[in-house]
A protein has these predicted regions:
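Buried hydrophobic positions in well-ordered alpha/beta secondary-structure cores of metabolic enzymes
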Residues: 20, 32-35, 72, 92, ...
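Solvent-exposed residues in well-ordered beta-strands and their adjoining turns
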Residues: 21-23, 123, 144-148
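Acidic/His- and Gly-rich active-site-bordering loop/insert found
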Residues: 1-60
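Glycine/serine-rich anion-binding loops at beta->alpha junctions
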Residues: 56-70, 151
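Acidic/histidine-rich catalytic neighborhood of metal-dependent amide-processing enzymes
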Residues: 65-136, 140
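Residues forming anionic-ligand binding surfaces in small-molecule and nucleic-acid pockets
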Residues: 61, 140-146
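Acidic-enriched catalytic cores of C-N bond-cleaving enzymes acting on peptides and small amides
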Residues: 152-157
Length: 157
């Protein structure tokens, strides 16, 4: 949401999110998440894909998050081909606003996560290959104050 100068609130849409639900009635359900946006705006020079060498691709979003989505797909193929695959349900969410704070997808994420046995996000590892257990975040806040305008030095009552 965004607060206008007059105090009214606008909803900010950040694109369409992809949700796939498989076996929603299963007793064991998982949530797998990722994102499709990148940190680079459309007019940034880093907008093309380049093969650096066979098997090594460079471009916006290749590691964060397309590499993670490829790992997610491999994990889902493993689930589907396992003997228990038919008993496991899952939702896959690929949101379109992760790099800008997930403002429009946060309620969707919370709703999909409810009641799941596990939720897995497929962000890339740290540069040395170790698991990223946490990352810094960001927040944007707006406050609406109502009342009568006054200044103690001019109107002490």
């Amino acid at each position: 949401e965004a607060v206008r100068a007059d105090g009214s609130i606008d909803t900010i849409e950040r694109g369409q999110h992809l949700v796939v639900s498989v076996r929603p009635g299963a007793n064991l359900r998982l949530l797998l998440t990722g994102h499709m946006d990148t940190v680079f705006p459309a007019d940034h020079p880093f907008q093309s894909l380049t093969w650096l060498e066979p098997g090594v691709l460079n471009g916006p979003g290749v590691a964060d998050m397309k590499g993670g989505i490829a790992v997610m797909l491999a994990a889902l193929q493993a689930v589907e081909s396992s003997p228990l695959g038919a008993t496991i349900g899952y939702d896959v969410l690929i949101n379109s606003d992760e790099e800008v704070g997930s403002a429009s997808s946060a309620p969707l994420i919370a709703g999909l996560a409810a009641g799941k046995a596990a939720a897995l996000t497929y962000e890339p590892a740290l540069p040395d290959g170790t698991l990223a257990g946490e990352r810094g975040g960001s927040g944007n806040f707006s406050i609406i104050v109502t009342g009568r305008s006054a200044h103690a030095g001019r109107n002490p009552h």
